[in-house]
Amino acid sequence: MDQDAFILKEDSEVEREAPGGRESLSDVIGFLDAVLSSEPTDIGGDRSWLHNTINTPQGPGSAHRAKSEGEGEVSTPSTQDNRSGEESRVSGRTSKPEAEAHAGNLDKQNIHRAFGGRTGTNSVSQDLGDGGDSGILENPPNERGYPRSGIEDENREMAAHPDKRGEDQAEGLPEEVRGSTSLPDEGEGGASNNGRSMEPGSSHSARVTGVLVIPSPELEEAVLRRNKRRPTNSGSKPLTPATVPGTRSPPLNRYNSTGSPPGKPPSTQDEHINSGDTPAVRVKDRKPPIGTRSVSDCPANGRSIHPGLETDSTKKGHRREHIIYERDGYIVDESWCNPVCSRIRIIPRRELCVCKTCPKVCKLCRDDIQCMRPDPFCREIFRS
């Protein structure tokens, strides 16, 4: 009887409303926003306001109502089409109980999911019951019924005060792993690693680990001065031997023209240029000797050897020049004399005296029978 009376009452209310009104989804969203906007601390209080009718300014289309004697179910009428009033009353009578049960289940699931998503990160359990005053204990037991340990209390304290974690990180303090047991100390010299790794602890403090120190300008200058004092030529060795007391220095090289005293090693130009910061590299001064060089009497490959320097014109006499070549299967060696004051050429030829003091015939060319080529110089020599 009560159910029939309730259906008749709802039908009369639907008839008083405008026919063809549609249920808007914004009413359900508004109801969920009103529930979710409440603080978590107010859930344990009186929640009888959840069973009151929510009046929204949506017009005749909103039909959310709650039964005063029910279990918190929200009744929503079925969606009406633009049909006649008689058809809407018949369809309302037949589908009213099913729509109420289905809408109530959907609202309960939505409310439970909304509260579970918002308070899922906290360790406080939410109780959405029938509407009674179900308070939450300050320190409720865990899932197995045992009282909470000190670690869980510390986790709750850190969740309630998130600024404390930021202060610890700003001060450079190590952040301990929550819910893990710290390893015991390995002795007086070892430090506790607080469960971070299984490596043996070192003697230094874990609070100083990973702290970067910005060097001051004074520290940088001290490092630069220390690096400058280090010798840069530690791996190099001087080319000349150093003077050792009680030992005799080696004789001077005949190519060395520096003229240093015998008790002191020869000095080079590089010693005056090098400073204390650059590595000492000594280069020997190799200057060509002053004077004439001995000229070989035998030319190579049929050509006379050019020593590269002018001969001394003060030395009077002749020099012997040779040319060796092959003729008709025989090796022919021809030789002749030229004045010493003349220039040595690559192409063998007779040269005249430049100083006008060299003899025309010497003991080397006295036995010559023929000349290499019949030039006036040869005729003059053999004629005389």
From Swiss-Prot:
Alphabetical list of InterPro entries matching this protein: Paramyx_V_Zn-bd
Effect on the protein upon substituting C358S: 55% decrease of in vitro zinc-binding
Polar residues bias locations: 50-59, 191-206
GO molecular function: metal ion binding
Record key words, sorted: Host cytoplasm, Host-virus interaction, Inhibition of host innate immune response by virus, Inhibition of host IRF3 by virus, Inhibition of host MDA5 by virus, Inhibition of host RLR pathway by virus, Interferon antiviral system evasion, Metal-binding, Phosphoprotein, Viral immunoevasion, Zinc
Residue positions binding Zn(2+) 2: C341, C353, C355, C358
Compositionally biased intervals (Basic and acidic residues): 7-20, 83-101, 150-168
Domain free text: The C-terminal zinc-binding domain is involved in binding to IFIH1/MDA5. This domain is also involved in viral pathogenesis.
Protein name per Swiss-Prot or TrEMBL: Protein V
Originating species: Sendai virus (strain Z)
Gene name of the record: P/V/C
